[in-house]
């Protein structure tokens, strides 16, 4: 569906279905469910990690820990984005050592966000394994990073922006592709 020059590629039901599949894939992997933890990257990844935890906990019949990770000061571009970085809280209420961690983000793009998240995560301990879950993989990698759990792969152009709208912050669940200049004005 096209609205105001933007293309809607996922609606609420599509996002729900993708998250249910991701939860199933995470649970089906060979891992000790007691050593599994989800870490959401601020901001969209935090909401998605919490949703995944709800789905995974139902499947495992017990809760798994969820943390939040701020990567602002680990980014290689923060000085280009803001003169004063906005730093959010990192909350990892579990030991990181020997843990199977799934880093959760809304969009996997160049790989730079995941690289920054790995740097930040390692400052908190030595996980046994780190995997990546993203609702959208839009390609265009600049670093050798890949996602293990992907909701949807989209073919995009570099002049487009993928916006993941989530009901927790935007009041609606939707994934939209827009022209980059259009997205900046919004």
From Swiss-Prot:
The keyword Transcription applies. Coiled coil: none annotated. One of its GO terms (biological process) is regulation of DNA-templated transcription. Its EC number is 2.4.2.9. One of its GO terms (molecular function) is uracil phosphoribosyltransferase activity. A motif (PRPP-binding) lies at residues 101-113. Pfam families: Pribosyltran (PF00156). Keywords: Glycosyltransferase, Transcription, Transcription regulation, Transferase. It catalyses: UMP + diphosphate = 5-phospho-alpha-D-ribose 1-diphosphate + uracil. Regulates the transcription of the pyrimidine nucleotide (pyr) operon in response to exogenous pyrimidines. Also displays a weak uracil phosphoribosyltransferase activity which is not physiologically significant. Belongs to the purine/pyrimidine phosphoribosyltransferase family. PyrR subfamily. This is Bifunctional protein PyrR.
């Amino acid at each position: 569906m096209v609205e105001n020059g933007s293309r809607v590629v996922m609606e609420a039901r599509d996002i729900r279905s993708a998250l249910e599949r991701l939860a199933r894939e995470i649970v089906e992997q060979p891992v000790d469910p007691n050593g599994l933890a989800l870490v959401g990257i601020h901001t969209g990844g935090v909401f998605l990690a919490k949703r995944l935890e709800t789905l995974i906990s139902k499947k495992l019949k017990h809760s798994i820990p969820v943390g939040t990770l701020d990567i602002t000061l680990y980014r290689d571009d923060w000085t280009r984005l803001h003169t004063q970085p906005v730093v959010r809280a990192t909350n990892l209420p579990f030991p990181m050592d020997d843990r199977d961690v799934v880093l959760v983000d809304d969009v996997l793009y160049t790989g730079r966000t995941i690289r920054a998240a790995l740097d930040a995560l390692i400052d908190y301990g030595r996980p046994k394994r780190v995997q990546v879950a993203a609702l959208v993989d839009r390609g265009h990698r600049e670093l050798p990073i890949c996602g293990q759990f992907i909701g949807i792969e989209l073919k995009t152009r570099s002049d487009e922006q993928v916006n993941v709208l989530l009901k927790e912050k935007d009041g609606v669940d939707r994934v939209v592709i827009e022209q980059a200049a259009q997205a900046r004005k919004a």
